[in-house]
């Protein structure tokens, strides 16, 4: 932390435990974009809240008000850019557009786009966090935690794969599920496989005195796409921004801002203001 270790004490829980990686591998610009003074103070003062119906409900409500709502569960087979237009192939049919804004993971864009050499080069630099969650119930009559808890000792690369936080979503709601969160990857270490990571999280819960009944949900995420410090310093973002509009293609989504809702939405609004 450049000789300022107290910053790590303030930032490590909302950054590393929230799945954004370790401070020795993630460029500081990402940390500062997310944990600006206002956001950091929310965590310090415990001024936090959640959406009662989950964040997906926000997008569902927005989508219901759109003139052209999102088309869900559509498989895009390929995208070509020819004759000043963009051709999108869906279920064997071609739809042609004036331009396209890509918000899906850019590192996979070459899999279905007629990607240029520059797109392939830049987007191959992207990595992401393997951030896993399980939701478990506790055996009746056994110990039940009163509140969510961080395990700060597990937020270091040396404890990769161990549970960093367990979470109780609702206040005064006995016997609700408990969610566990782990990271399985670090730039300088071997990737921990999914099943091993899950087992480590549950062993940590047992160490905390929790007697697991069953797992009711589990998920591994494509989480927080980013580039590492060498590519960041070499101007990765400047190079991608310089491509905006080429072949009627624009790039947005998490990688162009940060892996949370606010920064992603702000970038999207800025992109539209600049080019449309």
Predicted regions and their residues:
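A structural signal for the hydrophobic beta-strands that form the central parallel beta-sheet
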Residues: 70-72, 102, 251
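Internal hydrophobic alpha-helix adjacent to the cofactor/substrate pocket in enzyme cavities
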Residues: 264-276
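Active-site/ligand-binding neighborhood in enzyme catalytic cores
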Residues: 1-80
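Active-site glycine-centered loops adjacent to acidic/histidine catalytic or metal-binding residues
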Residues: 254
């Amino acid at each position: 932390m450049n000789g300022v270790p107290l910053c790590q004490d303030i930032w490590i829980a909302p950054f590393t435990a929230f799945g954004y990686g370790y401070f020795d591998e993630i460029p500081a610009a990402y940390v500062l974009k997310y944990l600006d003074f206002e956001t950091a103070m929310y965590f310090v003062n415990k001024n936090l809240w959640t959406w009662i119906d989950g964040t997906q409900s926000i997008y569902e409500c927005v989508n219901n008000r759109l003139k052209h709502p999102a088309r869900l569960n559509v498989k895009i087979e390929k995208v070509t850019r020819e004759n000043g237009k963009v051709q999108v192939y869906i279920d064997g049919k071609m739809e042609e557009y004036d331009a396209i804004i890509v918000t899906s993971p850019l590192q996979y864009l070459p899999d279905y786009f007629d990607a240029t050499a520059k797109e392939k080069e830049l987007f191959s630099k992207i990595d992401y966090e393997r951030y896993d969650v399980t939701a478990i119930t506790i055996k009746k009559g056994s110990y039940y935690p009163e509140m969510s808890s961080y395990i700060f000792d597990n937020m270091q690369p040396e404890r990769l794969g161990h549970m960093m936080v367990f979470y109780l979503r609702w206040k005064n709601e006995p016997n609700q599920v408990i969610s566990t969160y782990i990271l399985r990857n670090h730039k300088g270490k071997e990737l921990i496989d999914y099943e091993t990571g899950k087992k480590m999280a549950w062993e940590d819960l047992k160490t905390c005195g929790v007697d697991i009944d069953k797992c009711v949900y589990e998920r591994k995420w494509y989480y927080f796409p980013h580039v590492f410090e060498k590519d960041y310093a070499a101007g990765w973002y400047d190079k991608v921004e310089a491509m905006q509009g080429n072949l009627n293609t624009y790039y947005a989504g998490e990688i162009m801002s940060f892996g949370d809702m606010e920064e992603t939405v702000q970038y999207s609004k800025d992109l539209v203001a600049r080019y449309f």
